[in-house]
From Swiss-Prot:
Keywords annotated in UniProt: Disulfide bond, Host cell membrane, Host membrane, Host-virus interaction, Hydrogen ion transport, Inhibition of host autophagy by virus, Ion channel, Ion transport, Lipoprotein, Membrane, Palmitate, Phosphoprotein, Signal-anchor, Transmembrane, Transmembrane helix, Transport, Viral ion channel, Virion
Major localization class: virion
The name this protein goes by in its record: Matrix protein 2
Molecular-function annotations in GO: monoatomic ion channel activity; proton transmembrane transporter activity
UniProt site positions, description: Essential for channel activity, possibly by being protonated during channel activation, and by forming the channel gate and the selective filter: H37
Membrane-spanning parts: 23-43
S-palmitoyl cysteine: lipidated positions: C50
Free-text comment about domains: Cytoplasmic tail plays an important role in virion assembly and morphogenesis.
Intravirion side: 44-97
Membrane protein topology class: Single-pass type III membrane protein
Length: 97
């Protein structure tokens, strides 16, 4: 038994949908969601370089510093740098054979 036999059956002219009630609000909502999903997927594939480049580089700028005194900016930079610095005594040596 084919999966298509439950929803569609082949007629002499073309494929015909044998739905009991295609005006059901749930069916209409599912169709709208499906169409929107397809549109968003197409836009994502067309503009993925722009979108992901914006996310990758645009959000890494850090918090806005307008109106923040220079001393606080420098303190923030030092905190960020100290969080990145690695203690040389805690390296793990992994040898690959």
């Amino acid at each position: 038994m084919s999966l298509l036999t439950e929803v569609e059956t082949h007629t002499r002219n073309e494929w015909e949908c044998r739905c009991s009630d295609s005006s059901d609000p749930l069916v209409v909502a599912a169709n709208i969601i499906g169409i929107l999903h397809l549109i968003l997927w197409i836009l994502d594939r067309l503009f993925f370089k722009c979108i992901y480049r914006r996310l990758k580089y645009g959000l890494k700028r850090g918090p806005a510093t307008a109106g923040v005194p220079e001393s606080m900016r420098e303190e923030y930079r030092q905190e960020q740098q100290s969080a990145v610095d690695v203690d040389d005594g805690h390296f793990v040596n992994i040898e690959l054979e």
